[in-house]
Amino acid sequence: MSLTDKELFELNKKAVTEGFKIKPRINYTPVGGVNGPLVILDNVKFPRYNEIVNLTLPDGTVRQGQVLEVRGTKAIVQVFEGTSGIDVKKTRVEFTGENLKIPVSEDMLGRIFDGSGRPIDKGPKIFAEDYLDINGSPINPYARIYPEEMISTGVSAIDTMNSIARGQKIPIFSASGLPHNEIAAQICRQAGLVRPTKDVHDGHEENFSIVFAAMGVNLETSRFFKQDFEENGSLERTTLFLNLANDPTIERIITPRLALTTAEFLAYQTERHVLTILTDMSSYADALREVSAAREEVPGRRGYPGYMYTDLSTIYERAGRVEGRNGSITQVPILTMPNDDITHPIPDLTGYITEGQIFIDRQLHNRGIYPPINVLPSLSRLMKSAIGEGMTRKDHGDVSNQLYAKYAIGKDAAAMKAVVGEEALSTEDKLSLEFLEKFEKNFISQGAYENRTIFESLDLAWSLLRIYPKEMLNRISPKILEEFYGRDREQDDDEEEEEDPDKSGDKLIDA
């Protein structure tokens, strides 16, 4: 006897959840009231916080909700699919007695889901290996391992100067109109470990996976991500969760938690290294504010709830490495700063929780530089544990420090030039201006499909630093300077002679 897909799915669900305590379910009708995304229920027996509720509408459609608040026999439920069309008198409500769980499996790689975890790629339902609570399990702080070993993104400004450690959480601060979606897609295409390590479960490329969650994106952006991942072959190792702008706002509250639960399964049960990208966290915070306003809570700064810091931490702190497990979760949340304001509550609170930030700059974008990453306000607090001999290259730390110093001096020289003119500048200031121009055009700027290894980026950095005489590179140790400054100059001289044997003068190449 052949079974339908629906029957197989139900059998699988029953088998996976066997042993769970089954409680009788109680139905309630009518609904007490509707307020925005919330449904208020009266005379409820034993409601539980975070319990999942099924609402059956008069036309037979079923929507899911979650208990947000319990006051005696009254329960306040947030409905994930929105409250439009709910008839107060005819809607039937059923309390399931369970928290919201997501079916997880390795088969989720290469699949696309909506913001509630339902497949939208016309593929079959997921046959679950397990059902996991989307709020995750608390991790013993003592069991956490310090993040180390670098994740390569193929972007020079990130890999060389703001290296991301495996298990780190580092946000991208962007703003509306800036190419953060393109940068996110490029990171997904190019991300991987710098080298296979001895302690991983599997040294092959398949051991590195990506979980991508988009919240409040429009159809054009959604199509861009799906098409980009499919065309470049990165979809095979990626799980996508897409909450569109026309989807219910309330759904955005569970989308990042679904993504992180999937990431935890892949990292801690299949021992993969998972890069989790969440965009746009500003849409998530706005959904949080909407629910808070509907519950008539006392607002905090700019109308956001006072507990937003705590709520954001329940998402960001789910990154890291755990003792006894070879997998890791690295988080790169992306948020758009309203009015380019870095003091806005969303980037402000995010910066307190996370371990650095990557700053997308509008001025660089307006000058046609891609990716427009401003390295001066950017920071990776765990960079020191991810670079150096044995992990990248022994000159990495010194080169990064020197690039920061010379770029800052170049910015000062450009500001001085605007005041006094180029003729009044010293020789050192003119060198700094030359470095500034070539650093932005050749080092920060790169193609959207250009994947630079960390070694190519470091060699490119040396070719720029050789604009200065050796004695002016005061952030690099003499030993490193002796080994790399001369060697790289000789290599570049040889390359230039091959390209143009008759050329004389400055041997610096604009790589």
Swiss-Prot record:
Cited InterPro entries: ATP-synt_VA_C, ATPase_a/bsu_AS, ATPase_F1/V1/A1_a/bsu_N, ATPase_F1/V1/A1_a/bsu_nucl-bd, ATPase_V1-cplx_bsu, P-loop_NTPase, V-ATPase_su_B/beta
Keyword ATP-binding attributed: yes
Bilayer disposition of the protein: Peripheral membrane protein
The keyword Transmembrane helix appears for this protein: no
Disulfide bond entries: none
Main subcellular location of this protein, as a coarse class: membrane
CDD domains registered for this protein in UniProt: ATP-synt_V_A-type_beta_C, ATP-synt_V_A-type_beta_N, V_A-ATPase_B
GO biological process, one term: ATP metabolic process
Gene Ontology MF term list: ATP binding; proton-transporting ATPase activity, rotational mechanism
Signal peptide annotation: none
An annotated GO cellular component: vacuolar proton-transporting V-type ATPase, V1 domain
Region (Disordered): 484-511
Subcellular location: Vacuole membrane
Residues reported to bind ATP: 381
Recorded family membership: Belongs to the ATPase alpha/beta chains family.
UniProt function note: Non-catalytic subunit of the V1 complex of vacuolar(H+)-ATPase (V-ATPase), a multisubunit enzyme composed of a peripheral complex (V1) that hydrolyzes ATP and a membrane integral complex (V0) that translocates protons. V-ATPase is responsible for acidifying and maintaining the pH of intracellular compartments.
Subunit structure and binding partners: V-ATPase is a heteromultimeric enzyme composed of a peripheral catalytic V1 complex (components A to H) attached to an integral membrane V0 proton pore complex (components: a, c, c', c'', d, e, f and VOA1).
Name of the protein: V-type proton ATPase subunit B
Organism name: Candida tropicalis
Designated gene of the protein: VMA2
